[in-house]
Amino acid sequence: MSLTLKQADQASLSMQSLPKHVAIIMDGNRRWYRQHQAQCSIKSSSGHYYGAKVLPNIIESAFSLGIEVLTLFAFSTENFLRSAEEVAELFSLFHAQLDEQLPYLIENKIRLRCIGNLLALPPDLQQQIAKVASETQRHGMRELVLAINYGGKDELVRAFKKLHHDLVNKKISLDSVSEELIRLYLDTSEIPDPDLLIRTGGEMRVSNFLLWQIAYTELYVTDVLWPDFKPYHLLDAIKAYQHRSRRGGK
């Protein structure tokens, strides 16, 4: 995104109603690859290589526009059911993107946080995630959150197991259990719930993503497939968000 476009579009946004936390379901890589396979110079098992090329521009654009937390649904618990070739490609891309984004995150004082069942990931990927998280942990004003091996139902199961453990060991009482207490056991306990959830690829579902956290989140679905998603598509989503009236169930 050019500096001119950033300046013009930033001026068109209302800073008072800017979403603080934007989450994105990055869907459509495989459909995009089927449509463009003949023109692709890099052969990919599923198109994720081309989806990954979009990431740096979207990440930079989101934070330059004033977004404080950007959460990306990178790999679901169900994705392990895909072919070994596709899963291996995704893990390889995670390694590459973590290496590529680290200097940007450090330079711009952005913290990396990963959510999900990380213990089920390959040990080398766990180590790299821990390294990048450690090198950016002193930053807290802005955060890039990657959901890796994440599922909303799985998160709740893990949270309730931890809560049950504390109940049994009398660290908490049954009377103390509340929505706010449960929230403290979630992967996202230290970040606000999303204000805006964007889904690319046109599918009208949330795909087991942040089920607890998106109770009052504004949803925006675009038919644009993820590898075609540009900064101006992100801006369109934010502008649509700013024209809505958020009532939080009231």
Curated annotation (Swiss-Prot):
Transmembrane segments: none annotated. One of its GO terms (molecular function) is magnesium ion binding. Substrate binds at residues 28-32, 48, 76-78, 80, 82, 199, 205-207. InterPro entries: UPP_synth-like, UPP_synth-like_CS, UPP_synth-like_sf. It comes from the Bacteria. Its EC number is 2.5.1.-. Its cofactor is Mg(2+). Keywords: Magnesium, Metal-binding, Transferase. It holds the Pfam family Prenyltransf. Binds 2 magnesium ions per subunit. The active site is at 27, 79 (proton acceptor). Mg(2+) binds at residues 27, 218. PROSITE patterns: UPP_SYNTHASE (PS01066). Gene3D superfamilies: Decaprenyl diphosphate synthase-like. One of its GO terms (biological process) is polyprenol biosynthetic process. Catalyzes the condensation of isopentenyl diphosphate (IPP) with allylic pyrophosphates generating different type of terpenoids. Homodimer. PANTHER family: DEHYDRODOLICHYL DIPHOSPHATE SYNTHASE 2, DEHYDRODOLICHYL DIPHOSPHATE SYNTHASE FAMILY MEMBER. Belongs to the UPP synthase family. This is Isoprenyl transferase. The gene is uppS.
